[in-house]
Amino acid sequence: YGWMTMRALKEGYVTLEPALLFPFGGKEEIEGPNRQKLDQDLQYLGTSILAVEVYKISRLIDVACERPEVDKDRIAMMGLSYGGCYTLYTAALDTRIKAAVSSCFFNERKRYLWSDWSYFNFMNEFNDAEVCALICPRAFMIEVGDNDTLFAVDGAKAESVRAKKYWDGLGLPDRFNFTAFAG
């Protein structure tokens, strides 16, 4: 992932890398719980794996804020792919996050009806732009790859136009950024 964490460390940031539940790592599957089955079971109980993971990240921020080297007024979050998903949703729910970068996830969610973010009636309530409304007026950046084979760049561009309206409406267009990069 381009050594994101190392680059942040070199710039003087305190970084955290939460351990999240994924059924894969690199090219080989990791043995353990089936993520989709676990998510389905959690949804029967009224929650989801996404909600559990966002809660874990928020608790990690609690712990980090107790450390003297962490300025709790300058918390930022960035993530790539699933990390971009967790960044979008955690920043929407945890207002301690003052700036967030969601890379290679943000899109027109209706194109990707995966169990991780498909809930009863969600299309009538929250697409990615509406989740962004919960981040606004805090700083938010979306990065997408022009050659992403998973999430289409045109969907991300269209959804970002809808999201940007929240910042524009408050006269804060500089706090929202959409970037498509070669890759």
Regions found by a protein language model. Give the residues of each.
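Cap/lid segment of the alpha/beta-hydrolase catalytic domain
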Residues: 1-66, 109-116
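Extracellular/periplasmic catalytic domains that process cell-envelope and extracellular macromolecules
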Residues: 8-10, 134-136, 171-172
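Primarily recognizes the serine-hydrolase "nucleophile elbow" in alpha/beta-hydrolase
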Residues: 11, 58-124, 128-131
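Structural recognition of the beta-strand scaffold that forms the well-ordered cores
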Residues: 15-18, 76, 99-102, 134, ...
